[in-house]
């Protein structure tokens, strides 16, 4: 049985309000968890990890997944996406990415500077049409890329490793920023 993750912090204000955090985590994510548990009860997917469920139900990647309800992929994908999203943050103030870390060095190798990476990541977020996610992901060789995925889709469904994500669904920012996606 899947459960709602605990947040590793109490607040992300002033970037994300406590109201948005409570609504996003406690309502949206909880609904995905409840829905997935109902959908997989008594099936071969019960007891599987989120990654296993996403891989087994990704319709765009695995033709045999057509026999699995799209709702399974949508709910499992959203839980996986949100779990990474919520656990990647740290309260303000935070020193940010250690420039000596492996990830920082890989970003510098592929984008020249952290600022160039940030600009590319932000551009992908503000140009994503509709609802979805922006991901920093790595392939099996460790090469990084930034990708836009619609709805519940994610790197795991495509055999890639998710490293960093940003939720571009309106529920993630609307209470704080309304329709100003570009300021998020």
Please give the residue ranges for each predicted region.
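Short Pro/Gly-enriched beta-strand edge/turn motifs at strand-loop
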Residues: 114-122
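Alpha-helical transition-metal enzyme core signature, strongest for iron centers
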Residues: 25-36, 72-86, 110, 114, ...
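Conserved small/polar residues in nucleotide/adenosyl-binding loops
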Residues: 183-184
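Membrane-interface helix-loop-helix modules in multi-pass inner-membrane proteins
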Residues: 88-96
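A cross-taxon signal for low-complexity, glycine/charged-rich
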Residues: 66-69
């Amino acid at each position: 049985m899947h459960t709602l993750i605990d947040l590793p912090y109490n607040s992300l204000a002033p970037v994300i309000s406590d109201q948005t955090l409570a609504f996003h985590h406690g309502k949206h994510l909880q609904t995905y968890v409840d829905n997935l548990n109902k959908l997989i009860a008594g099936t071969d997917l019960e007891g599987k990890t989120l990654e296993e469920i996403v891989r087994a139900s990704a319709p765009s990647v695995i033709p045999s997944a057509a026999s699995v309800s799209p709702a399974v992929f949508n709910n499992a994908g959203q839980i996986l996406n949100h779990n990474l999203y919520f656990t990647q943050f740290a309260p303000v103030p935070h020193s940010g990415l250690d420039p000596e870390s492996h990830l920082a060095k890989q970003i510098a190798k592929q984008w020249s500077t952290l600022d160039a990476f940030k600009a590319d990541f932000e551009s992908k977020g503000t140009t994503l049409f509709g609802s979805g996610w922006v991901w920093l992901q790595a392939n099996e060789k460790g090469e990084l890329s930034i990708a836009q995925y619609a709805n519940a889709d994610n790197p795991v469904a495509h055999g890639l490793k998710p490293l960093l994500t940003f939720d571009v669904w309106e529920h993630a920012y609307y209470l704080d920023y309304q329709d100003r996606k570009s300021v998020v």
